[in-house]
Structures are given as C-alpha cells and as structure tokens.
Amino acid sequence: MKNFKKLLTSLFIFSIFSGILFSQANQYTPDPNAQYGYGVPLSSIPQNAQDFIRQHFPNIEVSYIERDWDDIEVYLANGTQIEFFPNGDWKEVKTYTNMPDSILPQNVMATVKRTYPQAAIIKIEKQFTIFEVKLNNMMELYIDNNGTLIGQKFDD
C-alpha cells in the first residue's frame, strides 16, 4: 500500500511539472505573420530591434539577418553580431571593434571602466538583471543593473 501511495504521489508531481513545462512551451510558438529563415530583410524584424541597430550602430550596414522561432541574429558589416529575443529585445552583442558605450546602462559602464579602464568590451550578454561583460583582456565581469560588480573570472 505504501508503494502504491508513493507511485500515485510521484505521478501527481510528474503531471504537475509536465503541465507547467507544456504551458511554458506555448509562450514560444512562432509568430505566423513573421518572416523566418536566412537572409530576411531588416524591415521584417520587430521595430525595437531595428531601433536598437539604428541607435547604437548608425553608420554600419546590416550584412545578414537570420530569424528562427526562438531568436533573431543580425550580422553587421564590421563583424558585429547582435542576438535578439523574438520580441525584439536584445540579449547579446559581440564585436571585435569598438562596442558603443550607449548599449549598457551608465552605472554598469562606469563599473567596467573603473574595474578595467584599459580594456575594451568585446561581448555583452543580458541575463535578466545581470550583465555578463567580456573584455579583450580575457576577463568576464558580472554586473547587476545597479552597477554593482557581482563577480569576475578569467575566461580561459
């Protein structure tokens, strides 16, 4: 009898977690009106993604855009790669040229400059309320929205 109760409890917990997972999966269903694939035009991605590119990379031509159901990747002529969520919010920027200071909030940028003033930013990744900032000196900084340095590590 005890084993039967354990089995029922396990099945109940499993069904709850399965329901949660399937309900979250529905949040990421493809937009039927969006254009997907390789080489999609700039005009087909969300307006806030277009505005981000124009604001932070105004004189750099868009070379290529790839759009899947779960992200949008934009490649610029200078080698910069920008990754967006399907709603057009940016999630990652990689560059080997000058990263625009305007991408990060001022207090986050101030922490980067104060911590490693000679280093250049080559990658920024937004993870909820934390920014992962990779520098050209092989350091990765973890900074919250308030500009507090949470951690750092050598990226080997």
Residue ranges and their predicted role:
Residues I72-Y75, F131-L135, M139:
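Conserved histidines in hydrophobic membrane contexts and catalytic metal-binding motifs
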Residues E140, D144-D156:
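Short, low-complexity, Pro/Ser/Thr/Gly-rich segments in the mature regions of secreted, periplasmic
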Residues F22-D51, Q55, D155-D156:
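Sec-dependent signal peptide cleavage junction
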Residues M1-Y28:
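Bacterial Sec-dependent N-terminal signal peptides
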Residues L7-T9, I13, K113-I122:
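C-terminal low-complexity, charged extensions that often adopt amphipathic alpha-helices
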Residues G39-N59, M99-A120:
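Short, non-transmembrane alpha-helical segments in secretory-pathway proteins
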Residues T97-M99, D156:
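A short acidic/small-residue loop/turn micro-motif
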Residues N48, I53-Y96:
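Acidic (E/D-rich), amphipathic helical modules within compact regulatory domains
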